[in-house]
């Protein structure tokens, strides 16, 4: 009897130890993963990604997104179709400035440095542009749009600089390409979660213009990163020769069918996914037949949706990063189209007929949709890093992402045009359900172009050696490491 009681106690102790071990693995697993990346890629790369992708882009963009929505709706009083079209204009900076500064960071060092000055420049431009919006009263719509486009350009400059680091490391450590994109996306998603969570509260407390003023701190951080950035000084460079070599490498690469075909697919899949989110935003907040959400509620719902982004990153990193590109694009596109049915059910108010309140239904919709969108982005990012040759990583990755952003701009413009044709306005939403239905059907069309996507899996796919330019890689000029804070203080 005593032995049986002892066995029961031992089994109970084993279960307790197992639970503690599982809890420890949940907590320590991400820490070990970060340590692994820091040891193989240098801790400074991890710090750079968290600062730029997490704080400036994730937190800053999500906070600014909600502030811009209310600024356009309440301060500038624009129609949803007009706002949808105007939002496409701000994307122009990502199409023009990202490839432009991508090639400049590769071939034109400033004061002998390839990366530091561009981080500093991006931060200064972002701070100045947001200060103009936040401090000017009665700012004309198109002048406000101009400064928003400039701030978007500043974010694009910072983004292309960190992209160059990621792409270089992906070429140097191809087995870690998926992990690096997971780090970027996870940082962004966590920052996005915090930004959306605080957005509604801050807009309510200080107004949309006040939020623009607060966002200057995230751009100031970008300049700080530029000050701390350490890289070898370049001496005796030839801009003309570097530019000529970069153009030749780009032309040689873009002619490769393994490059232009997936690039075309990425543009098609973005352009055909009509963007009507501004029309839905007006319906959420202004329509008498809609939920009539307050500012705090909108921010909270968007923050809950960001949990879906984090789940998407975790799902990709744990289960999907070894699957073939074509298979992943197929399933993510199918799920992307199906997730749009949540919006259709909501606009038609079918959820109320099934006893599902708007709040609960939109939360579920946000989590599922964000998870699928993040999965799609992850696959696109990993594929883009695989398509970049050595020596012009920043240039070519920026070119590929500008193609992707051109697709998003086309999607936003076509979505605004559709809202205008269907007469969806600030007060009339009768045809919004039809716009949602058309958008969902259009999301299925890119599946017809899947033959453009390479069949290889994400770990083994690689461009030919003559395209990658592996023989001409210069490791000495690509040592992209951040100086430690201690070293910086010592130099000061």
Curated annotation (Swiss-Prot):
Subcellular location: Membrane
Gene Ontology CC: membrane; plastid
Gene3D superfamilies: MFS general substrate transporter like domains
Keywords carried by this UniProt record: Membrane, Transmembrane, Transmembrane helix, Transport
Pfam families for the chain: BT1
Membrane topology: Multi-pass membrane protein
Main location: membrane
UniProt xrefs under SUPFAM superfamilies: MFS general substrate transporter
Source organism, top-level taxon: Eukaryota
Family matches, as PANTHER family: FOLATE-BIOPTERIN TRANSPORTER 1, CHLOROPLASTIC, FOLATE-BIOPTERIN TRANSPORTER 2-RELATED
Similarity field: Belongs to the major facilitator superfamily. Folate-biopterin transporter (TC 2.A.71) family.
Job of this protein: Could mediate folate transport.
Name of the protein: Probable folate-biopterin transporter 5
Organism of derivation: Arabidopsis thaliana
Lineage: Eukaryota, Viridiplantae, Streptophyta, Embryophyta, Tracheophyta
């Amino acid at each position: 009897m005593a032995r049986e009681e002892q066995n029961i106690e031992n089994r109970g102790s084993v279960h307790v130890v197992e639970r503690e071990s599982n809890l420890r693995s949940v907590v320590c697993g991400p820490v070990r993963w970060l340590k692994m990346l820091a040891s193989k890629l240098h801790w400074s790369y991890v710090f750079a990604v968290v600062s730029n992708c997490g704080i400036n882009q994730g937190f800053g963009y999500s906070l600014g997104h909600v502030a811009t929505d209310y600024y356009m709706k309440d301060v500038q009083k624009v129609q949803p179709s007009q706002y949808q079209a105007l939002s496409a204009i701000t994307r122009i900076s990502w199409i023009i400035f990202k490839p432009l500064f991508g090639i400049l960071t590769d071939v034109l060092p400033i004061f002998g440095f390839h990366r530091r000055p561009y981080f500093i420049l991006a931060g200064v431009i972002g701070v100045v542009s947001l200060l103009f919006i936040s401090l000017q009263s009665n700012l004309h719509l198109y002048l406000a749009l101009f400064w928003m486009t400039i701030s978007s350009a500043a974010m694009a400059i910072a983004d292309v600089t960190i992209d160059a680091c990621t792409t270089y490391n992906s070429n140097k450590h191809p087995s870690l390409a998926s992990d690096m994109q997971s780090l970027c996306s996870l940082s962004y998603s966590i920052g996005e979660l915090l930004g959306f969570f605080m957005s509604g509260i801050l807009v309510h407390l200080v107004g949309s213009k006040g939020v623009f003023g607060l966002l200057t701190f995230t751009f100031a951080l970008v300049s700080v990163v530029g000050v701390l950035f350490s890289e070898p000084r370049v001496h005796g460079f030839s801009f003309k020769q570097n530019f000529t070599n970069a153009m030749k490498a780009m032309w040689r690469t873009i002619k490769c069918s393994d490059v232009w075909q997936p690039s075309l697919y990425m543009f098609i899949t973005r352009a055909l996914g009509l963007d009507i989110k501004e029309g839905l935003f007006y319906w959420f907040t202004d329509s008498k037949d809609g939920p009539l959400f307050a500012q705090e509620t909108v921010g909270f719902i968007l923050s809950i949706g960001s949990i879906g982004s984090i789940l998407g990153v975790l799902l990709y990193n744990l289960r999907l990063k070894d699957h073939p590109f074509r298979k992943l694009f197929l399933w993510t596109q199918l799920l992307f189209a199906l997730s749009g049915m949540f919006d259709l059910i909501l606009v038609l108010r079918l959820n109320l007929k099934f006893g599902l309140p708007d709040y609960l239904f939109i939360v579920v919709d946000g989590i599922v949709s964000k998870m699928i969108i993040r999965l799609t982005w992850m696959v696109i990012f990993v594929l883009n890093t695989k398509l970049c040759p050595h020596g012009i990583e920043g240039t070519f990755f920026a070119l590929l992402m500008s193609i992707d952003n051109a697709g998003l701009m086309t999607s936003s413009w076509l979505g605004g045009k559709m809202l205008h044709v269907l007469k969806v306005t600030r007060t009339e939403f009768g045809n919004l359900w039809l716009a949602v239905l058309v958008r969902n059907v259009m999301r299925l069309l890119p599946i017809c172009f899947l033959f453009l996507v390479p069949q290889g899996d994400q770990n083994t796919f690689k461009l030919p050696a003559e395209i990658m330019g592996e023989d001409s890689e210069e490791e000495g000029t690509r040592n992209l490491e951040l100086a430690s804070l201690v070293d910086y203080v010592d130099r000061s």
